Amino acid sequence: MAIKTFEEYLKSLRKLKPTAYMFGERIENVVDNPRIRAGINATGATYELASNEKYKDLITTISPFTKEPINRFTLPPQSIEDLVARVKINRALGGYVGTCHQRCTGLDCLCTLSIVTYDIDKKYGTHYYDRFMDFLKHVQKNDLTGNASVTDVKGDRSLSPHEQPDKDMYLRVVGQTKEGIIVRGAKVHQTGSLSSHEIIVLPTRAMGKGDEDYALAFAIPSDTEGLIHVVGRNSMDTREIEGVDCGNIRYSKYCPTLIFDEVLVPWDRVFMFREVEFAAEMVSRFSAFHRQSHGGCKSGKIDAMTGAALLMMDYSGTAKVSHHKEKVIDMIHMAETLYGCSLAASYEGKKEPSGTYFIDPILANASKIHEGKEMAEAVRLMVDIAGGYVADLPSDRDFENPEIGELLKKYLKGATGVPVEKRIKMLRLIEKMAMESADTISDIHGGGSPAAHRLTIFRESDINYKKSCAKRLAGIE
């Protein structure tokens, strides 16, 4: 079956047996662990909406490769329409889950590999593109989720990969057999790795002579022997485990560190091996695609944040306060700016030799620069409207306590006629969207650091053209 339902997605994850740890203990049942399940549910929304009549036509399409219906999260864009659909899907999902749905990064890897493997083959006569296409068809036919395994631990940032005192600071090949390559290292910030069927590895930086062992791209199942998922902490990570004060009662985000401890990668899953000069292209293509994805996703999250702010105005009796309305207008403007930049990046896309369409990198990076600033400002405005109880609202357990619960509810009342429970729930949701570190930090660093976004814009811009405009107007030859 080419398109899975949500239940089929859960069933497919249950068949996997990943090695995973959290809070110092081994996780034996990933799917039913409440902390991980909230993240799995977020990815599961990409499957759920594929069968929802409202979103079905947007999220599903016919694969030009398998000729079967597929989820768009398995399709490298083959047209401008596909590029635009990526942004619209991500916005819809951002509002639907109110956090990261985690599936865009795997698609960004597929997009990248569909371009760069072709380019490598053209130069060296290798067969990476054919290998990748076999993998892509496997992903499409089974509606698999991929995790983008890109960011290395990096060690001493002033040194290149091969110069590191500890050679494992960047993922590298440490052996070869007739079956494949053996790799060792670690990748960090692995959003949704346990929600994924496949781990797709790309280089994290440009490389040069001496870095050949680090110039790798490949894909392996998420439960491959030697692959260890260590779930990271974030500021609200015990709420789901405790079963109270979750705020977002359905979805959340988690980000493991992924350790590759002598992992065997079959040759048919290797998509780049020691071609150092193509590491930079891998990074730049992935980064651009991912920054385009963010513009859709985060505009959708701001939609949910704006809704929360508006409801707090209703529940607190401030719906007619003019300066609150001004803040809401600012939030709407922020969402549309991110969305508009990502749509523009899509409409300005161009077809690559492999047939995949690539977005305009300047506009994609412009969207990400806005996101880094505007998401923080949107959070500030939402909290400004909501008030101080975002920081210190008593626990759900206090409200249910027979001795103090009714007293608390009495003093938490807001607008006349509004049940106090609505106000409490909305305050808790706002706390979640404002203060969950796994999400708020990615608004700044997701897809690369803010400095990287700015440098990319300068590097990709036609500086000489801009100078020529000014020279002509000033009469300078």
Where in the sequence are the language-model features?
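Alpha-helix capping/hinge segments and adjacent helical runs
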Residues: 362-477
